[in-house]
């Protein structure tokens, strides 16, 4: 309530101050500093990227009076550019995550200008898939974060399409989760397998509830599917433990 009473100039000034202050404080921490300080720098710069996104969104919305999709595009682009410059493909997980979030928001906003939720979801999923591929090839450091972040984006994108494709969305998400589990197990990429399992635990109940909501066998089906997912999890854990060499 109080935030709404703050003038636009005050909001812009506050966001600009936070973005600049957190960036400057983080910039004082050198790469050779203690690990705790390096993590602090990552958190500060993440906050700076978030403030830059809020500033850009505020300008687009309250100053330019742009439509909602353009506001998301501006906010995401600002975060992606600022975080990308701080990241510069180095081992900086927080900046990697901030850049990915910015790219996803910007891509979703751009898709929203021309289409509806289905277009937004598909574009977000496509960006996530590209991020997974880059993590697979170890192009984006750290690769584990690229696999996990991109995988989550693909699953989220499938869910976003539900506003237009209520029947197809849960099936699409479940298919993506199954592919992640299968590929992760076959190639011993545990992060991708974990993302697939988490997606399965989310999309499987959704799929069963959506298509069989009036069936008396839903509780039994949920139980069987839950047991199946737990069995897959145990298999993955056993394969992973065997793949790790003994020291």
State what each model feature region is.
Residues 1-247:
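Alpha-helical multi-pass membrane segments and their bilayer interfacial helix-loop junctions
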């Amino acid at each position: 309530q109080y935030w709404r009473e703050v003038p636009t100039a005050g909001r812009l000034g506050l966001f600009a101050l936070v973005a600049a202050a957190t960036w400057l404080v983080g910039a004082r921490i050198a790469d050779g500093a203690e690990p705790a300080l390096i993590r602090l720098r990552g958190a500060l710069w993440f906050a700076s990227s978030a403030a830059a996104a809020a500033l850009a969104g505020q300008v687009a919305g309250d100053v330019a009076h742009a439509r909602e999709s353009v506001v998301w595009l501006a906010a995401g682009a600002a975060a992606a550019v600022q975080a990308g410059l701080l990241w510069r493909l180095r081992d900086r997980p927080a900046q990697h995550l901030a850049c990915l979030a910015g790219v996803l928001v910007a891509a979703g906003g751009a898709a929203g200008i021309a289409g509806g939720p289905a277009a937004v979801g598909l574009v977000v999923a496509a960006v996530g898939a590209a991020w997974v591929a880059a993590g697979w090839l170890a192009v984006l450091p750290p690769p584990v974060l690229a696999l996990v972040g991109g995988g989550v984006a693909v699953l989220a994108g499938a869910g976003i399409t539900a506003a237009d494709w209520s029947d197809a969305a849960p099936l699409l998400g479940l298919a993506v989760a199954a592919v992640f589990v299968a590929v992760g197990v076959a190639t011993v990429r545990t992060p991708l397998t974990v993302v697939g399992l988490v997606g399965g635990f989310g999309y499987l109940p959704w799929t069963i509830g959506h298509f069989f909501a009036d069936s008396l066998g839903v509780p039994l089906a949920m139980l069987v599917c839950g047991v199946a997912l737990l069995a897959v999890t145990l298999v993955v854990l056993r394969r992973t433990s065997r793949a790790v060499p003994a020291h």
